[in-house]
UniProtKB/Swiss-Prot annotation:
Residues 1-23 form the signal peptide. The chain crosses the membrane at residues 190-210. The modification Phosphoserine is found at S251, S259. The gene is TMX4. Its main location: nucleus. GO terms for molecular function: disulfide oxidoreductase activity. This is Thioredoxin-related transmembrane protein 4. It comes from Homo sapiens (Human). The keyword Signal applies. Disulfide bonds join C64-C67. The lineage of its organism: Eukaryota, Metazoa, Chordata, Craniata, Vertebrata. Keywords: Disulfide bond, Electron transport, Endoplasmic reticulum, Membrane, Nucleus, Phosphoprotein, Redox-active center, Signal, Transmembrane, Transmembrane helix, Transport.
Length: 349
């Protein structure tokens, strides 16, 4: 009887002890923290850490399948970071659009190597072995670095980071309007258009105010002096222009006078030549008339061949009548000469 009663009691005690041990061990096991990741998240506030030492950065997005496939490889590579003497980081482009703009990330996933502020793009696969060989064999030395305006630390890329951060905020605001508040998409677009116009007008007003603040007006006496100087300069310029025009007019008048004198001299020369020609013509006509008259008067006696004077006289009279100039012809010649003289006189005037 005693042995039968002790058996159930021992069993109950053993069960209670096991339960107590399990109760005490459970919270300890639950309190153990999970394995900490060696990949350091990079943000806009701590990204300058990559300017010192050697780093490998990965740009990813939570919705990217290719990025999710390389997560385990990237974690394994980060665990060996102490052995490789390299730091490993990652950037979420959804949460940090400014950093994606600073590094000008256009494809995902994107990998970058940084060594003392010099950045290079890693274009190999995101596999642990390839990443490890890239560091151990120093394959990054054969890759052209991002220098000049392409460097993430340059002023150009800083401006690009600002633009990307603004675009990210606008995108989040658009999602808030359309998803959270349920506003139609076109209403959101109208809101952004109006906001852009208002912002532009406000910036223009600010620039005008700044220019007015930095613009120092001249004192009154200085402004009056400057106005007087300006007027005197304008008057001096007007006088110079007037003098130049007068000189030009004088030169034109002198040229016209010279041309008129030359024309008058030419006309006088032509008139003298015409008068000489007329005098020659008159002399020739007078000489012809004198010759004809002398021939008419100088008719000889009758010939030795026995021809009587009475027979010859009618013939010579007829020849003299035919050869003697007609008074009407001489009058016509004299009239033509007079007309020519009057024409030349008119030309001379």
């Amino acid at each position: 009887m005693a042995g039968g009663r002790c058996g159930p009691q021992l069993t109950a005690l053993l069960a209670a002890w096991i339960a107590a041990v399990a109760a005490t061990a459970g919270p300890e096991e639950a309190a153990l923290p999970p394995e900490q990741s060696r990949v350091q998240p990079m943000t806009a506030s701590n990204w300058t850490l990559v300017m010192e030492g050697e780093w490998m950065l990965k740009f990813y997005a939570p919705w990217c399948p290719s990025c999710q496939q390389t997560d385990s490889e990237w974690e394994a590579f980060a665990k060996n970071g102490e052995i490789l003497q390299i730091s490993v980081g990652k950037v979420d482009v959804i949460q940090e659009p400014g950093l994606s703009g600073r590094f000008f990330v256009t494809t995902l996933p994107a990998f970058f190597h940084a060594k003392d502020g010099i950045f290079r793009r890693y274009r190999g696969p995101g596999i642990f072995e390839d990443l490890q060989n890239y560091i151990l064999e120093k394959k990054w030395q054969s890759v052209e670095p991002l220098t000049g305006w392409k460097s993430p630390a340059s002023l150009t890329m800083s401006g690009m980071a600002g633009l990307f951060s603004i675009s990210g905020k606008i995108w989040h605001l658009h999602n808030y309007f359309t998803v959270t508040l349920g506003i139609p998409a076109w209403c959101s677009y109208v809101f952004f258009v109006i906001a852009t116009l208002v912002f532009g007008l406000f910036m223009g007003l600010v620039l005008v105010v700044i220019s007015e603040c930095f613009y120092v007006p001249l004192p009154r006496h200085l402004s009056e002096r400057s106005e007087q100087n300006r007027r005197s300069e304008e008057a001096h310029r007007a006088e110079q222009l007037q003098d130049a025009e007068e000189e030009k007019d004088d030169s034109n008048e002198e040229e016209n006078k010279d041309s008129l004198v030359d024309d008058e001299e030419e006309k006088e020369d032509l008139g003298d030549e015409d008068e000489a020609e007329e005098e020659e013509e008159e002399d020739n006509l007078a000489a012809g008339v004198d010759e004809e008259r002398s021939e008419a008067n100088d008719q000889g006696p009758p010939g030795e061949d026995g021809v009587t004077r009475e027979e010859v006289e009618p013939e010579e009279a007829e020849e003299g009548i035919s050869e003697q100039p007609c008074p009407a012809d001489t009058e016509v010649v004299e009239d033509s000469l007079r007309q020519r003289k009057s024409q030349h006189a008119d030309k001379g005037l």
